Amino acid sequence: MKTLLLTLVVVTIVCLDLGNSFSCYKTPHVKSEPCAPGQNLCYTKTWCDAFCFSRGRVIELGCAATCPPAEPKKDISCCSTDNCNPHPAHQSR
């Protein structure tokens, strides 16, 4: 019985620790950072602003509890694994 209880305690601690380790790439620094508890999605949001033709699309990366809602003229994608939202310019081709 004590072995079973000890096993359950160890499994609980491991699971709680893993729950806090979800990470996504975040802007403006485009580096992997831990997400807040409950935020288990990474998102990438891109759009054109007044300077789109000279510098390219604006890119926002971050964590979310739910995928951000659609917005006019903005592309939004979400994924649910660690660091699954790399900056498009940093992806291997």
UniProtKB/Swiss-Prot annotation:
* Cysteine pairs bridged by disulfides in the record: C24-C42, C35-C63, C48-C52, C67-C78, C79-C84
Q: Which UniProt keywords apply?
A: Acetylcholine receptor inhibiting toxin, Disulfide bond, Ion channel impairing toxin, Neurotoxin, Postsynaptic neurotoxin, Secreted, Signal, Toxin
Q: What is this protein called?
A: Long neurotoxin 1
Query: Which GO cellular component does the record give, naming just one?
Result: extracellular region
What Gene3D superfamilies does its record include? CD59
Q: Give the matching InterPro entries.
A: Snake_3FTx (IPR003571), Snake_toxin-like_sf (IPR045860), Snake_toxin_con_site (IPR018354), Toxin_cobra-type (IPR054131)
* Protein's cellular compartments: Secreted
Q: Which family does it belong to?
A: Belongs to the three-finger toxin family. Long-chain subfamily. Type II alpha-neurotoxin sub-subfamily.
Domain of life of the source: Eukaryota
Function recorded in the entry:
Binds with high affinity to muscular (alpha-1/CHRNA1) and neuronal (alpha-7/CHRNA7) nicotinic acetylcholine receptor (nAChR) and inhibits acetylcholine from binding to the receptor, thereby impairing neuromuscular and neuronal transmission.
Query: Which residues does UniProt assign to the signal peptide?
Result: 1-21
